[in-house]
Amino acid sequence: PLGYPVGLMDLFTPVSSGKININTASLMVLQMVPFIDENRAAQIITLRSGYDGQEGTDDDTPAGSQGMNVLAFLASAGLSQQEAAVAARYFDQRSRTFEVTVEAEVNSYKRTFIAIVGRNSPRDVPVLSFYWR
């Protein structure tokens, strides 16, 4: 049997806006987009990591910062203008679907609540799914 570095769970989500957040997508997820191979995906990650090369630090330069829109970001990663225009249709600059976990305790009774929410705007955050453990 063939071995794969990732599974479907690492690449797809059943609840989303239908676009990939270019600022948080993994190397493997980026490669699902037309014209983005492993080298270009690695370049996208390098670009968004900022000067220190570490993601999640103060010097990160995500798409959308300092006037760098998705098209310009993709062009900086080595895509032609035509390739960038096609690939850009699959990307967004922010995440819109989140999992929220809350642990509650009332009179020594504990329960964990989990919700999937969609962030349409700061004031429009519908609950898409809700359950408890």
Question: What is each residue range found by the language model?
Answer:
Residues 1-133:
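Compositionally biased linear targeting/interaction segments
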